[in-house]
């Protein structure tokens, strides 16, 4: 019979940098998970994506074992990396902080496709463009 799920924990952790300190430790400690076991496994799985923030969904079972699924980095993180900026605009409708090309938007949309609720790359691009607009990043043709 399948194991009974007791908790599902969602976190956003920098790739390859999971450690038992907050936010990872307290979130997993409450569920009774082996924190170091998770940290080692997560860091090994995300070592090639250094510098990005990786969303992860950790499923904890009744016997305190766990599985986890890593998602693609948030569109905002990918846009900031493509535009080479530290953070988005505080006033996106007034102050534009950077610009990205349509090709960069398409590349980000293709990266995000597995996690987006989009039927094709064009609709995924529209979602990424909306995120860019809300961050004060303009899109160049």
UniProtKB/Swiss-Prot annotation:
Keywords: Methylation, Ribonucleoprotein, Ribosomal protein, RNA-binding, rRNA-binding. It comes from Listeria monocytogenes serovar 1/2a (strain ATCC BAA-679 / EGD-e). The lineage of its organism: Bacteria, Bacillati, Bacillota, Bacilli, Bacillales. GO terms for biological process: translation. GO terms for cellular component: cytosolic large ribosomal subunit. One of its GO terms (molecular function) is large ribosomal subunit rRNA binding. Forms part of the ribosomal stalk which helps the ribosome interact with GTP-bound translation factors. Part of the ribosomal stalk of the 50S ribosomal subunit. Interacts with L10 and the large rRNA to form the base of the stalk. L10 forms an elongated spine to which L12 dimers bind in a sequential fashion forming a multimeric L10(L12)X complex. It comes from the Bacteria. SUPFAM superfamilies: Ribosomal L11/L12e N-terminal domain (SSF54747), Ribosomal protein L11, C-terminal domain (SSF46906). This is Large ribosomal subunit protein uL11. Pfam families: Ribosomal_L11, Ribosomal_L11_N.
